[in-house]
């Protein structure tokens, strides 16, 4: 989640070479840590929650800093897989890097470029990562095999009808699920001060049959190994939900974020034999330092 924080001329980083080196070392480490700490899908939070306030920020802070970098630690309470009734705690890192209003790297948005930019909109492309699914994550997945991690490409757009931000994104996996997924969401600030902000908003997700079969389907071989009945889902809306994101700067640089999300599985995703809970909850806490 991106935040603007208290005003300060020191927010503009004057040592881009140092920042580039730091970013490079961080990304090297990033490739070595568990996949679920990376920019990912299926994401436990709505995508807008990773970038809440970015588009609105340009209305109140002009010019934007050349570099905006924050890094910290995070922990998340989330289902073991989409549709699970079991929960676990997943640690990770919180990394957000932005260059003006041009390029970015964040945990939920991935590595991207804003190709079109205006006072009330932005649109671009990004490269993310589908972490896949490991059958050892839950006894409810035994016999289904693993879904391999794979990169995915994304096209996104945001538009502001102040104070509401509308967002849509379409992504395509390459390996793993090889499917198309689209998200549409909206969010707005409901509370705020110089050091404290709260955003809330709904999200709906549509997935094609390839994605649905990979994550919610049961083919004949999987049916034999797992004991589940065969199930061939089609395309359609897979979920709808609501999220909230809050940030508190207790100093000029240190801040805490709290994110919560409720997701309701729909259609064939809800009817899948591996779906044990239609309602999915996620809580995420992080502490980070903004340079």
Each predicted region: which residue ranges?
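Residues on the lipid-exposed face of transmembrane beta-strands in outer-membrane beta-barrel proteins
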Residues: 73-77, 93-99, 111-115, 155-159, ...
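Outer-membrane beta-barrel domain signature
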Residues: 60, 80-84, 112, 140-146, ...
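Short glycine/proline- and aromatic-enriched beta-strand/turn motifs that initiate or cap beta-hairpins
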Residues: 38-103
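Residues that define the transmembrane beta-barrel architecture of outer-membrane proteins
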Residues: 67, 87-93, 119, 147-153, ...
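Outer-membrane beta-barrel transmembrane domain signature
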Residues: 41-44, 49, 53, 174-175, ...
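Cleavable N-terminal export/targeting peptides
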Residues: 1-64
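Transmembrane beta-strands of outer-membrane beta-barrel pores
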Residues: 75-81, 99-101, 127-133, 161-163, ...
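Repeated loop/turn-to-beta-strand initiation elements of outer-membrane beta-barrel proteins
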Residues: 69, 101-105, 121, 163-167, ...
């Amino acid at each position: 989640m991106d935040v603007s924080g208290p005003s300060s001329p020191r927010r503009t980083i004057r040592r881009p070479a140092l920042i580039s080196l730091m970013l490079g070392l961080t990304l090297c480490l990033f490739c070595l840590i568990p996949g679920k700490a990376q920019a990912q899908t299926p994401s436990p939070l709505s995508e807008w929650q990773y970038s809440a306030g970015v588009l609105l920020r340009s209305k109140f802070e002009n010019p934007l800093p050349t570099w905006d970098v924050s890094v910290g630690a995070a922990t998340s309470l989330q289902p073991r897989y989409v549709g699970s009734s079991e929960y676990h705690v997943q640690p990770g890192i919180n990394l957000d890097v932005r260059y003006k209003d041009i390029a970015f790297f964040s945990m939920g948005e991935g590595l991207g470029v804003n190709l079109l930019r205006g006072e009330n909109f932005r649109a671009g492309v990004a490269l993310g990562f589908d972490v896949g699914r490991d059958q050892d994550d839950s006894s409810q997945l035994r016999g289904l095999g693993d879904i391999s991690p794979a990169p995915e490409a994304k096209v996104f757009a945001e538009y502001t009808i102040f104070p509401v931000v509308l967002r849509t994104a379409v992504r395509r996996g390459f390996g793993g699920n090889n499917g198309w997924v689209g998200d549409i969401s909206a969010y707005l600030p409901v509370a705020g001060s110089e050091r404290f902000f709260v955003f809330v908003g709904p999200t709906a997700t549509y997935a094609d049959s390839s994605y649905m079969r990979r994550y919610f389907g049961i083919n004949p071989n999987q049916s034999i190994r797992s004991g589940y009945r065969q199930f061939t889902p089609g395309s359609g809306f897979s979920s709808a939900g609501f999220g909230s994101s809050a940030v508190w700067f207790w100093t000029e640089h240190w801040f805490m974020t709290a994110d919560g999300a409720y997701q309701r599985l729909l259609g064939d995703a809800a009817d899948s034999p591996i779906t044990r809970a239609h309602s999915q909850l996620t809580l995420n806490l992080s502490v980070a330092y903004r340079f």
